[in-house]
């Protein structure tokens, strides 16, 4: 299966990449800064797409141009932990959903499997004295 992995340079995404490769998936990395991908990881990728995880058109184009069967979103986890704004988290998730839906519709309605690391948003964070989504 060809998988578009958003957030491959982050804490979660960098751990998901070896797992996807171990299960013989072809991985297309979607990143803002390709230089952050280690040379070892780069050698295992099918391809690299540079873009913003909050850009609907870029996500849709990546899915369609690389003929991805699935999307795994590990982007935006830093937005939930206070490292960036909470608004970025919502924008990323909305863009991934919309871009994936539009890509599926353009393919004639064929479903695209999609996994989100959204459960992290309800976890307690050491950076804040309260739940992230009170």
Q: Where are the predicted features?
A:
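N-terminal Rossmann NAD(P)H-binding glycine-rich loop of SDR-like oxidoreductase domains
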Residues: 2-25
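SDR active-site strand-loop-helix element
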Residues: 6, 30, 74-75, 114-120
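Conserved Rossmann-fold NAD(P)-dependent oxidoreductase catalytic core, especially the SDR/UDP-sugar
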Residues: 95-134
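Short, glycine/serine-rich, charged loops/turns that create anion-binding
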Residues: 10, 34-35, 79, 121
């Amino acid at each position: 299966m060809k998988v578009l992995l958003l957030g491959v340079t982050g804490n979660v995404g960098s751990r998901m990449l070896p797992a996807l490769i171990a299960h013989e998936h072809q991985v297309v990395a979607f990143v803002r800064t390709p230089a952050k991908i280690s040379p070892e990881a780069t050698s295992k990728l099918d391809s690299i797409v540079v873009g913003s995880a909050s850009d609907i058109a870029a996500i849709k184009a990546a899915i369609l141009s690389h003929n991805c069967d699935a999307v795994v979103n590990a982007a935006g986890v830093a937005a939930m932990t206070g490292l960036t704004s909470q608004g970025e988290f919502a924008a990323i998730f909305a863009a991934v959903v919309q871009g994936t839906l539009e890509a599926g519709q353009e393919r004639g309605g064929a479903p695209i499997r999609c996994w989100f690391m959204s459960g992290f948003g309800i976890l307690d964070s050491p950076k804040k004295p309260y739940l992230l989504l009170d």
